[in-house]
């Protein structure tokens, strides 16, 4: 005899069908909740780079913030928009400090040694993105540098969210870029249509 969810009896009129439907619904509920629980924090929050909460009022942030440490966004695209904005801020600060905009300098600021294994983070990003550690990168606002920087963002997502590189949502990265730099929308679309330029994935 099938074990039915509480409150449903197979002896009732149509009880067997009700039992089967209720069992399927319960199994689906358990499956969905397991998937939700197994998601990493960055994925649940639509915050792929795990940007911490601060006084910044991020565009696309959820009205109700239930995570005490990290920002929660409405969509993954808004999470990536914030990531692009942070990188642009880094570029501008590095310029004022006379520092080159490189993967090493970016990660040393993003994941300082006081809280992270910075060297391991850098090595992982370099391996995943195939970018040189001291290679000077173009500013995020310059669409010509999108190829390398989007690989950097994807690699950082892998580390922050525990994803395989092939599972990173590249479309959301592009959507986030367009939200961050709306004047570059058409240029990015043209860039993405260029097969020679898009081979980096």
Residue ranges and their predicted role:
Residues 3-201:
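Cell-wall polysaccharide-cleaving catalytic domain and substrate-binding groove, primarily
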């Amino acid at each position: 005899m099938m074990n039915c969810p509480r409150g449903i009896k197979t002896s009732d009129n149509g009880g067997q069908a009700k039992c089967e439907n209720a069992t399927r619904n319960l199994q689906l509920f358990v499956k969905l909740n397991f998937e939700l629980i197994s998601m990493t924090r960055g994925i649940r929050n639509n915050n792929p780079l795990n940007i911490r909460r601060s006084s910044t009022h991020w565009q696309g942030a959820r009205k109700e913030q239930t995570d005490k440490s990290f920002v929660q966004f409405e969509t993954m695209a808004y999470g990536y928009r914030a990531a692009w904005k942070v990188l642009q801020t880094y570029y501008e600060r590095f310029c004022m400090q006379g520092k080159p905009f490189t993967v090493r300098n970016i990660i040393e600021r993003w994941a300082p040694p006081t809280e992270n294994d910075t060297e391991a983070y850098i090595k992982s990003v370099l391996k995943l993105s195939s970018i040189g550690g001291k290679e000077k990168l173009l500013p995020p606002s310059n669409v010509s540098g999108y190829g390398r920087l989007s690989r950097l963002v994807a690699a950082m997502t892998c580390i922050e969210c525990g994803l395989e590189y092939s599972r990173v949502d590249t479309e959301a990265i592009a959507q986030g870029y367009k939200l961050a730099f709306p004047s570059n929308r058409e240029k990015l679309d043209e860039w993405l249509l260029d097969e020679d330029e898009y081979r980096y994935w």
